[in-house]
């Protein structure tokens, strides 16, 4: 089938790569315009554009798409069967969605209608979901409201973070796109609606995955150890706190139970109830910090101006003091 691919970040590249290697014809790629790097004003292409250019696929980077008559004319002239969309970065208007013969299809990284919106992977980890997945839906004007053609679930492991789960869902999206396109192709002469499921058919709670903002990245030590652990994984590697007025990105922690502290004979301050307090500095183990519930052990972090460091290195860099607070 003749396909126009819409995508921008690294997350989208695997699907483009798999489709390029298939029997389908990728007639063009639409991606976000080059962005200026924060330093040096050098323009940086999107990962999707880099891959498409390497593979000699025509690339379009429109600044605007809504009411862009010239661009819409180009899309019509390309006469494609499908638009395949994954993390393009802008909402497509109906005038564009309806151009392909067999409509426009999107891979969404959640089990719809749970986590419609911009940050489904982050929110699935933040909320402690045990499963997630990918659904291929026919696009419509509403935000992630389309009917679902194919879907597959995967388990969210306890140690999954944004990086690992994103990789799993990117791979899964590429797999499901092939299956969905095959279903569409095999049913070209039938009513595709017979294969689609309404999102309400799944009997799931509707939730919205709003965009992550700067405040979301700040660790609140008055939260439970479990909530802090989820935040660090969900917003990897950018969840942060401050110590001695310096920013510290927390990369990896371990929740310590009372049993484990007693079993390993860790020497810590006892009868301490203030969250965010350093209660233990243990050589070859690390810094132990209080939360609303269990204490946590700091395994990896990045102090501003430094590289990611582990336990003993962090003790040397931070020069921490038992009884002092993070975020003070």
Swiss-Prot record:
Kindly give the Pfam families that the UniProt entry links to this protein: Formyl_trans_C, Formyl_trans_N
The family database entries (SUPFAM superfamilies) matched by this protein are listed as: FMT C-terminal domain-like, Formyltransferase
Q: Which transformation does this protein catalyse, written as a reaction?
A: L-methionyl-tRNA(fMet) + (6R)-10-formyltetrahydrofolate = N-formyl-L-methionyl-tRNA(fMet) + (6S)-5,6,7,8-tetrahydrofolate + H(+)
Here the disulfide bonds are: none
Cellular component aspect of the GO annotation:
cytosol
Tell me which UniProt keywords the record has, alphabetically: Protein biosynthesis, Transferase
Molecular function GO labels: methionyl-tRNA formyltransferase activity
Q: Which Gene3D superfamilies match?
A: 3.40.50.12230
Tell me which domain of life the UniProt entry assigns to the organism this sequence originates from.
Bacteria
The residues listed in the UniProt record as binding (6S)-5,6,7,8-tetrahydrofolate, with positions renumbered to this chain, are 110-113
- Which EC number(s) does UniProt give? 2.1.2.9
Q: Return the InterPro entries for the record.
A: Fmt (IPR005794), Formyl_trans_C (IPR005793), Formyl_transf_N (IPR002376), Formyl_transf_N_sf (IPR036477), Formyl_transferase-like_C_sf (IPR011034), Met-tRNA-FMT_C (IPR044135), Met-tRNA-FMT_N (IPR041711)
Q: Which family does it belong to?
A: Belongs to the Fmt family.
Q: Could you tell me what this protein is called? A: Methionyl-tRNA formyltransferase
């Amino acid at each position: 089938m003749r396909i126009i691919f819409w995508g921008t970040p690294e997350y989208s590249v695997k699907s483009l790569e798999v489709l390029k290697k298939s029997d389908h014809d990728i007639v063009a790629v639409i991606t976000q315009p080059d962005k200026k790097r924060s330093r040096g004003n050098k323009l940086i292409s999107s990962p999707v554009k880099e891959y498409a250019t390497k593979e000699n696929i025509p690339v379009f980077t429109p600044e605007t798409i809504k009411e862009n008559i010239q661009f819409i004319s180009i899309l019509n002239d390309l006469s494609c069967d499908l638009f395949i969309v994954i993390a393009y970065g802008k909402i497509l208007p109906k005038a564009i969605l309806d151009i392909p013969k067999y409509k426009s299809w999107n891979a969404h990284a959640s089990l719809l209608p749970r986590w419609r919106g911009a940050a489904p992977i982050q929110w699935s980890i933040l909320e402690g979901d045990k499963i997630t997945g990918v659904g291929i839906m026919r696009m419509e004007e509403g935000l992630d409201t389309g009917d679902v053609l194919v879907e597959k679930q995967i388990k969210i492991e306890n140690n999954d973070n944004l990086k690992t789960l994103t990789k799993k869902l990117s791979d899964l999206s590429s797999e499901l796109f092939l299956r969905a396109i095959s279903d569409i192709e095999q049913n070209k002469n039938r009513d595709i609606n017979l294969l689609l499921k309404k999102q309400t058919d799944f009997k799931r709670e509707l939730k919205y995955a709003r965009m992550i903002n700067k405040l979301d990245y700040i660790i609140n030590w008055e939260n439970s150890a479990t909530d802090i652990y989820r935040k660090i994984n969900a917003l990897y590697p950018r969840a942060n706190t401050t110590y001695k007025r310096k920013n510290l990105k927390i990369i990896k922690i371990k929740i310590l139970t009372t049993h484990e502290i007693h079993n390993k004979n860790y020497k810590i301050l006892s009868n301490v109830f203030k969250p965010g307090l350093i209660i233990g500095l243990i050589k070859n183990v690390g810094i132990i910090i209080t939360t609303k519930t269990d204490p946590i052990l700091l395994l990896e972090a990045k102090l501003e101006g430094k590289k990611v460091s582990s336990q003993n290195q962090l003790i040397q860099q931070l020069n921490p003091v038992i009884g002092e607070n993070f975020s003070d």
